[in-house]
Amino acid sequence: MELQTIPNNISLANGDSKGVQLTFKNIVYKVDNKKYKKLVKKQEKAKKKNDTESSTGDMNTGVSTTIEKELTILNNVSGVIEKGELVALMGPSGSGKSTLLDILAQRKSTGKITGQLLVNGKEIGEAYKKYCSYVTQEDVLLQTSTVFETLKFYADLKLPGVSEIEKIKRVEQIIEDIGLTKRTHSKIGGVLPGGILMKGLSGGEKRRVSIGCGLVTNPSLIFLDEPTSGLDSVAALQIMKTLLNLTLKGVTVICSIHQPRPEIFALFNKVMVIIKGKMIYSGSNILEYFESLGYPCPNNTNPADFCLDSAVEIGEGERYTEICNQWQKIWENELLNEIEYPPVNVEKPKTASWGYQYWILLGRTWKDFLRNQGNFVARVGTAVVTGLLFGVCFAGLKETEADVQKILGTIFFLITGLNLTPFAVISLFLSGRTLFNAERASKIYHSFPYYMAMVTVETLIVFLVALINAAICYLFAHLRWTAGHFFFAIMVYFFVHLLSDFMISTIANLTGTSDMTFAYGSGLSVIYMLFAGFYVPTNELPKSFGWLHWVNPLFYSFVSLVVNQFEDLPLECTRPNIPVGNSTIQIPCQFSNGNQVIEYYGIDDWTRGSSFGVVVAWTVFFFWTSYLALHFLNKEKR
């Protein structure tokens, strides 16, 4: 079976021969050996216990010399990829093919890397990223966006200096190139947060959209990690034909791939094989080369399977080092005859401003919220239902001493209800984080504009939920209804809901799983509710637990609302008169005005403004903890 041969003089669709040659020389990649670290700790403990140095280890560390400090994943890997080639990067699991792909795409964020990476024979540093694009194995796309909107989003953020008309033309051309013209305005689809299924594209079509996202910047190099993984045979072949068509326009495509079917394997015009971190072959005549090594391909055998099986056999055999050295010499000789290309323009890629990023992200986030109708209905519907339930349960309250406890209960349960509401959208936080990680790894936008866009939309939703919930309850329960008191109460409920949102978001970004977020969040919320000042007044709490009031945002929320409700409020005493001899006397009331209620709960030192200020401060605190956790703890490690 012969591999495809693409001529070197292919021109692009726009007539500009912008293809580039990629050369990588002596790539070495090492990572820390965890076993080594464990051994160091173990022997350090032994030293302290015995107060003597281990006789079997290094003189300085006491570490056994049979365990290396670093593991070598790639060892002097070199190769040349010409423009317009479709390259298969093959090898068994753990051979280092995905690692090499990440290094070539400059996406490796861990370990130590040495070697050279040249474009048209020159090192171009940071500008290298302008020429390449990377498509991950998983299709991480926003389910509620259409194909056009997805590609336009990438165009808006990655082509900031291009006019709107040119961006649209570029997107339409990409859609045509990936064969999705008839699906231009179809939604991506998939399982939305909360388990709702939205109909959309097939798996193969989603993969083509992912490839299209990588084509927005008109790259010269495209790297794909297992592009056919998880697809059926028909969809996989369609994907590879799409990639082959791109090479005909001068684009160089490098794929890591595992055991492709014969029809797919025949599309590649170069195959690179890595075994145990070393390159043992790179070229277009792999079957002939393996036959020269004594590994002829049997008839009626999948060539890809044969190559992989032969590579594994070589890696386990005695000739492994000999064959690796032999190939190194062949490569060095071929390097002398390497095709020369003109130097590339090393202009640094442009990036959109934070303000522009925020605007584009805000538009997408708002559309996503409106299209996820299940989420919208659930949140607003819950606000209406809980507001009605609270209102009916506490309906017709009066400004009397007898109803003081019911009024306090209404206020407290409104606070706790809004504090617990964010638990219903934990899946939203986590699904958004997955998309964010994938897009930030592609250098589309900075984390802060993304976060602010999410916060803006969430703030509007939170305000709506708090307004509906509190307004219904206040209307039914007849709480203090003057404009000033009602507006202040709405603002407190709004900030309670918002700070709870930020708190749950912080925990979600710290833990990364819904189960852990729910466990930690619910535990913290229970503590907040218990020490909010309703069940146990401040002046009755044991001194050893007093600090739990002062670090509790729900306490300050409760204080501000109680002061707002009862300050300078006269309370009618409705206790009955009882006969005493020939006359009657009225049982004295515990409270004759609202100030006595405030004093009874030990919060008379607080004004509604000062306590509300602390609530705002807590909201700001959780706002920043959520962002910092998102920014620093959610970076993709490869």
UniProtKB/Swiss-Prot annotation:
MF (Gene Ontology): ABC-type transporter activity; ATP binding; ATP hydrolysis activity; ATPase-coupled transmembrane transporter activity
Keyword NAD in record: no
Membrane topology: Multi-pass membrane protein
Positions annotated to bind ATP: 91-98
Gene Ontology CC terms, in alphabetical order: ATP-binding cassette (ABC) transporter complex; membrane
GO terms classed as biological process: sorocarp development; transmembrane transport
Residue ranges occupied by any ABC transmembrane type-2 domain in the UniProt entry: 374-633
Pfam families in the record: ABC2_membrane (PF01061), ABC2_membrane_7 (PF19055), ABC_tran (PF00005)
Domain ABC transporter positions: 58-301
Keywords: ATP-binding, Membrane, Nucleotide-binding, Transmembrane, Transmembrane helix, Transport
Ranges where the record places region Disordered: 42-61
Localization, UniProt: Membrane
TM ranges: 376-396, 410-430, 459-479, 484-504, 516-536, 544-564, 612-632
Cited InterPro entries: AAA+_ATPase, ABC2_TM, ABC_transporter-like_ATP-bd, ABC_transporter-like_CS, ABCG_dom, ABCG_transporters, P-loop_NTPase
Family designation: Belongs to the ABC transporter superfamily. ABCG family. Eye pigment precursor importer (TC 3.A.1.204) subfamily.
Identification of the protein by name: ABC transporter G family member 12
Organism: Dictyostelium discoideum (Social amoeba)
Gene that this sequence comes from: abcG12
